Amino acid sequence: MKFLIIQKIKREVPIEKWAKMLPLQFKYFENLEKEKTLEVYYHLIGQQGSMLIVNVDSDEKLSKIVGQDPMFFDSEREIYPLTTRQTHEKQIRELLQPEPAGF
């Protein structure tokens, strides 16, 4: 299952700490890319944050990815489950189908 993770560094994090932790986070993301867990990474310009799309098979794996991030305690994040347009369209079509008579 794919998840969108938007994470931003907390404003109160001292720049010195941020400067030390950022290379560790880059290395962490690089490893996730090699594992094919991290599909997409973008820096959020002007936001001191990033946007990731991860592909995992369990909530345990998602929790591990988030919890092992070197910037875990210094970031705030939002996590959203994703689905394809085709899956979404199929679900909507099923919802909009009229129920058979007699129900």
Mark where each language-model region is.
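Conserved, structured core segments of small domains
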Residues: 1-103
